[in-house]
């Protein structure tokens, strides 16, 4: 793949040798600052503590995250042993954490200090498992043990294909699945960009980055580990800080990666303050469809942007839409980008809906519209302890994303929704993302999302929930609804026009920003009935 070290930790240790005094990790409020030399020492310390609890290559270690430096330290301590960091948000209900443990069977627990879940409040199922609180510079308490300084950076024989972490998919519905990610997941795409000399997404050695995305989310974990491998100063935390703008300015941040809801928040703050972030060079975004006006505003301040598309299962990003002359027009049309060199994509048409994959007997050439399959060097290893689901989603190295996309002649791909969310009305397939996109092009609409309304005659009708750009009285709300309806009459076929339009205060979304359409339907119904 490259002449660089074959594991994430080895690459970070290489940076520690080059810049030992440089800060590797720090909270956005200035606390928990950890130079690269101390990061390496703390990794040794906690790896020793884990080894004393019988953790070894292939063992699972539950990492209860607070998204701060200690969380990433815990991941790297696992990496030194070849153990697998099982990521769990410290704000999750104990029952959910208990379910994660039933799936992964961890041998130890590492708890970040800002987690709401502590060693005394762990689920009953974890009572017999050693729990270690991760505190920078304080040793390991009752589990203090001689550090692993006499051992190599990682266990001998570990390589790019060895597992590093598990992330549970949030999804919009269904049983949680533990996505098993290899070391290569976190550097395959950056290596491609560097080798190809492409500036779609760029990292500069030693720059300052900030990620508000959780370490339990592929975007958060991937972004911070990638920047650590480039010797960057990684700012973390701040989930409860009211101002993104303040964090970026006070820490002189050069690069950041946001979900579209946070991008909208940042734009709102910058507009209100009539200011910019002078240090900011690059803003990446992804997880759900962005509002083109927000991207246009950021680019007008001189900041380069890059939309990244992918899933936990594809190792974060597989397609990219960087700043170019007509990128805003592409975003307005629903584009999510084009594949990186070395990433293969395939659109399976409706008549290939059996899910057998691009290499199946009888599979035709990639369609212009269909379910997207991705073959990337960053793809997951599979779902932990779930071979049946793995065989359904990962076939011959190809991941079935479940997303419906359309390929245009310019080589860019445009998202239309998820195959599982397709609304079928009178036998016609309606792509939810296309309905959403049309509504968000109406002046006065901040965001919008459609949902399914059961109907005895057509099977289903389209409902639309809208968040207005400003507060409005009943008369203004009626006027906005009429404007939206008129826009659909001009822009869409009749079957895809909303039969009901509801003004709501917010669109329910997953942690990664994806619309929770079932919850949205319930919320819209409650608004209509006055519940």
Swiss-Prot record:
Q: Where does ATP bind?
A: 218, 308, 312, 403
Q: Which GO terms describe its biological process?
A: fatty acid metabolic process
Protein name in the entry: Fatty acid--[acyl-carrier-protein] ligase MmaC
Instruction: Extract the GO molecular function terms from the UniProt entry.
Output: acid-thiol ligase activity; ATP binding; metal ion binding
Catalyses: a (2E)-enoyl fatty acid + holo-[ACP] + ATP = a (2E)-enoyl-[ACP] + AMP + diphosphate; a (2E)-enoyl fatty acid + ATP + H(+) = a (2E)-2-fatty-enoyl-AMP + diphosphate; a (2E)-2-fatty-enoyl-AMP + holo-[ACP] = a (2E)-enoyl-[ACP] + AMP + H(+); (2E)-decenoate + holo-[ACP] + ATP = (2E)-decenoyl-[ACP] + AMP + diphosphate
Q: What is its EC number?
A: 6.2.1.-
**Functional description taken from the UniProt entry:** Acyl:acyl-carrier protein ligase involved in the biosynthesis of a unique class of isonitrile lipopeptides (INLPs) that seem to play a role in metal acquisition in M.marinum. Acts twice during the INLP pathway, catalyzing the activation of (2E)-2-decenoate as well as probably the corresponding (3R)-3-isocyanyl-fatty acid as acyl-adenylates (acyl-AMP), and then the acyl transfer to the dedicated acyl-carrier protein MmaB.
The record's section on InterPro entries has: AMP-bd_C, AMP-bd_C_sf, AMP-binding_CS, AMP-dep_synth/lig_dom, ANL_N_sf, ATP-dep_AMP-bd_enzyme
Knockout consequences: Deletion of the gene cluster mmaABCDE causes a significant decrease in the intracellular accumulation of zinc in Sauton's medium where metal concentrations are relatively low.
Which key words tag this protein in UniProt?
A: ATP-binding, Fatty acid metabolism, Ligase, Lipid metabolism, Magnesium, Metal-binding, Nucleotide-binding
Instruction: Please indicate which superkingdom the organism of origin belongs to.
Output: Bacteria
Return the broad EC class.
ligase
Matching Pfam families: AMP-binding, AMP-binding_C
Annotated Mg(2+) binding lies at 169, 313
Requisite cofactors: Mg(2+)
Q: Name the encoding gene, please.
A: mmaC
UniProt lists the family membership as follows: Belongs to the ATP-dependent AMP-binding enzyme family.
Which NCBIfam families does this entry report, sorted A to Z? PRK05857.1
Q: Note whether Magnesium occurs among the keywords.
A: yes
